[in-house]
């Protein structure tokens, strides 16, 4: 199994609105999605693309704000009130094959495979099995899912 490209970096934030201002004013981001709720995961999400060197899209940042105190992101923000890097996300061509491969390696998978913010199947790997980094594995978007939200 070979991982594909880095799709995005997830950043927990107490305020998507304040974070968007930061990414626009400090990082020069111009491509910002409309925030949307994912109640099944207890979060509000917004995608920000930093500009690339050629003027195209650079790195995509997924801003994640808790919808309530029951959200896992709320717990993250209790420890780190200003927010910060939450996870990295890599693409794979086949999510079921990737899951089986990581399970075969003895890596702990956090919960079932589910549909993520880009509209494609995802799962998360425990940071203790991934060199201290919470890692999201995402099936490479196809068709309508390419645009995300």
Name what the model sees in each region:
Residues 19, 30-31, 55-59, 70-72, ...:
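Short loop/beta submotifs within extracellular cysteine-rich repeat domains
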Residues 1, 11-58, 97-120, 125:
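Core segments of cupin and vicinal oxygen chelate
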Residues 34-37, 72-79, 116, 147-149:
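Short, tandemly repeated low-complexity microdomains enriched for cysteine and small residues
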Residues 138-143:
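Short beta-strand-to-coil "C-cap" segments at the C-terminal boundary of structured domains/repeats
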């Amino acid at each position: 199994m070979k991982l594909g490209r880095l799709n995005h970096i997830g950043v927990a934030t107490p305020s998507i609105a304040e974070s968007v201002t930061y990414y626009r004013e400090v990082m020069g981001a111009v491509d910002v999605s409309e925030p949307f709720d994912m109640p099944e995961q207890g979060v509000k999400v917004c995608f920000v693309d930093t500009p690339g060197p050629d003027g195209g899209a650079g790195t995509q940042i997924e801003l994640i704000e808790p919808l309530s105190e029951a959200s896992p992101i709320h717990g993250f923000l209790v420890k780190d009130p200003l927010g910060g890097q939450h996870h990295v996300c890599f693409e794979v061509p086949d999510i079921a094959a990737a899951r089986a491969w990581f399970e075969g390696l003895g890596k702990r998978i956090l919960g079932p495979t589910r549909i993520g913010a880009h509209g494609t199947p995802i799962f998360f790997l425990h940071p203790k099995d991934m060199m201290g980094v919470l890692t999201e594995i995402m099936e490479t978007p196809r068709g309508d899912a390419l645009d995300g939200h």
